[in-house]
Amino acid sequence: MLKFICYPKCTTCQRAKKWLDDNKIEYELRDIKLDNPTFAELSSWYKLSGLTIKKFFNTSGLLYKSLDLKNKLPEMSEEEMLKLLATDGMLVKRPILVGDNFVLVGFKESEWSEKLK
């Protein structure tokens, strides 16, 4: 079953959830703030996604900005970045949809349609 990791108050996550429900796609819901991803999960998702590690950061979030990560990330290793992401779910871009052989980060309807229909 798909894992849908989101923050319920996030409007993009709400749109993604509605899209999943409207398309009758079953998923397991997980609140990223209450149950943030572990280092092992993030490492696995990062490898499976084919994305750059920076795509996993919620660059518009208050925590990202308050920690000045825009300037700090370029000096960090991938392992350091993954460990940092694992400290607080609010640092992680959302929603995340995890399937057996794919990971989608953020909600782009066309991308989700291509993977799921």
What is each PLM-predicted segment?
Residues 1-23, 27-32:
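Local sequence-structure signature of Cys/Sec-based thiol-disulfide redox active-site neighborhoods
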Residues 34-117:
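Thiol/selenol-based redox catalytic cores and closely related redox-interacting motifs
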